[in-house]
Amino acid sequence: MHHISRQDPNYRYVTDWFWPFDRLARAIGISAADLDDLIAAGCGPGAIYAFSSRYGWWSALSGHVDGHEGPPPPEAERWFAPAAVWGFRRATLAQRRGASLEEAARQNAALFTEEFAEALERLPEARFGFADCFDGNSIIDAVARTRAGEEWAAWVEGGYAVCLRIFTGETCVRKESLGAWLKAHIASPESHPLTAEAALSICERLAQLMLPFAPWQRPNGTPGVTIDRLVADLGLGVELPFRGDDGRS
């Protein structure tokens, strides 16, 4: 039997950064039933974090902390990503103009795909995160669109909502590519050299995109293995991403 405490750092994190279902519906301006339909159609992600007395904490990225397989049970308390509000609003607007739920979901995915492809063309760091999308200086369109479909599916399944403050084609490419750049440097500084100033700058750009991650996830997540690691390696203090890190509630 698992118990939740309002003083639990994980509870404080989730309630600081994520919304209950009714708040998300209210932010979009739709009913709970309509939001259920949008989620079921794949217009955006469902629950991102959940807690149940049976299995404890769960996230869409890594499942249950206690190793239990499967989704959270029906009685679990659930929290949703504020970032999802934009896609659900866009889908609601499409429905008002006559689109079906399925068409609204396709329109959201198509917009993401176009943003993703444009970001690959424009961002120099994209080659770190999506090298398979390039042939020399050219984008391989079919590969880029396949990768876009995979990344969109990861958003709808909830994984990216653990990571990103806002999800667009550009923020997806930037997050994956900046993270891969830092990981490559950490793994092999000789092959992927960065000055201290350059490493710090990339960390800052990545931090602008990312949520802190729940306390149980951060050490092994992208912020922990890149930003936290390099800030410490550079002797430039320590990241304090959570309420209470300063010893106060």
Task: Tell where the protein language model's regions lie, with residue ranges.
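Sequence-level detector for tyrosine residue identity
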Residues: 11-13, 49, 55, 160
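Short, amphipathic alpha-helical "recognition" segments used to contact nucleic acids or chromatin
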Residues: 5-16
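Major-groove DNA-recognition helix of helix-turn-helix-type DNA-binding domains
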Residues: 31-65
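Polyanion-binding surface elements
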Residues: 15-35
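Long, charge-rich, low-complexity intrinsically disordered regions
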Residues: 54-249
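Primarily N-terminal secretory
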Residues: 1-2
